């Protein structure tokens, strides 16, 4: 993955099926993960 780290209020975690991202910020935040 490339780019700057997501803000602390954005939590990401991996389950056995998929990677889930939860936005805990008061403002909308777009998180983009690129696999190369």
Curated annotation (Swiss-Prot):
SMART domains: A_amylase_inhib. This protein is an effective inhibitor of pancreatic alpha-amylase. It is 5 times less effective against human salivary amylase. It comes from Kitasatospora aureofaciens (Streptomyces aureofaciens). Pfam families: A_amylase_inhib. Gene3D superfamilies: Alpha-amylase inhibitor. Disulfide bonds join 9-25. This is Alpha-amylase inhibitor AI-3688. The keyword Disulfide bond applies. Keywords: Alpha-amylase inhibitor, Disulfide bond. GO terms for molecular function: alpha-amylase inhibitor activity.
